[in-house]
Amino acid sequence: MAKFRKKPVEIEAVQYDGTNAREIERFVNGDIGMIGGTLDYDPIGNDYFIKTLEGKMTIRKDDYIIKGVNGEFYPCKPDIFHKTYEEVK
């Protein structure tokens, strides 16, 4: 069996702190809407959702929104994010 190592890849990410929805909106290229955008908002539940390659996922406070190498977006829990990524200086 062969072993493999993940290639080092630089990504862009923004952490959702519960108050920076506009920053997230700009990060996903302004593609926000109640229906049909990359980032959807449900005013009843006060929840944000992001469309990913795997389907629609809920964004929770403290989640990171990551822009992948092919321009796709997806959420990542903070503990996983900090185990996987470090800031590029």
Curated annotation (Swiss-Prot):
In terms of superkingdom, the source organism counts as Viruses
Protein name from the UniProt record = Uncharacterized 10.3 kDa protein in GP2-GP6 intergenic region
* Taxonomic placement: Viruses, Duplodnaviria, Heunggongvirae, Uroviricota, Caudoviricetes
